[in-house]
Amino acid sequence: MENDKLSPTSLAFIALTNEYCQLVENCGDHGREGMVEALIKLLPRIYITVTDLEPNLEYLDAFISQALDEASYDVVRDNLSALMGEDDAYLEVFLDDMKYSDTPIATSISENLADLYQEFYNLLVSLRDLNTEEQRQILGMCKENFVEYWGQTLCNVLRALHSLSVANRDYYDNY
């Protein structure tokens, strides 16, 4: 009977991705400093939890649907960009292209956060109405996507958010 349930780690990961999606969808309610602070606390928890997920390489029948359309993605990215303002852009150092470039490569916090939102939104939509085994397969695919793509995105944007948080003079007043 225990095999009919997701592991506590899987449930925690789903809850954290849902929390992330809600945070991003309501980013205007937090202000920039509040949003940065919330993300700095949430993103490492997502990272740790996904690394603890059991790998599931048997996902022949499962797939993560591409539920988030381009217009919705653009709204999320634009809202985050407006919130981050002039601090949205940062220099990327972990792109393969950077190895061969003398020119810095810029990216944006808003685009990275929107990319994560898209991954998590699609995951959550895909998990709905599936049986436990299919959910395990979807989570296995998500973990593989973490290794291949969005794990680095999460780390990169966390680095940029950390830089913003410590640059804020009020940050040290809280300690």
PLM feature segments, named:
Residues 31-35, 109, 131-135, 139:
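Residue-level recognition of alpha-helical structural elements
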Residues 8, 12-22, 38-45, 49, ...:
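Charged, amphipathic alpha-helical oligomerization/scaffolding segments
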Residues 2-30, 82-93, 99, 103-106:
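Generic detector of solvent-exposed, compositionally biased contiguous segments
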Residues 104, 119-175:
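Acidic, proline/glycine-rich low-complexity IDRs
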Residues 56-124:
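Long amphipathic alpha-helical segments
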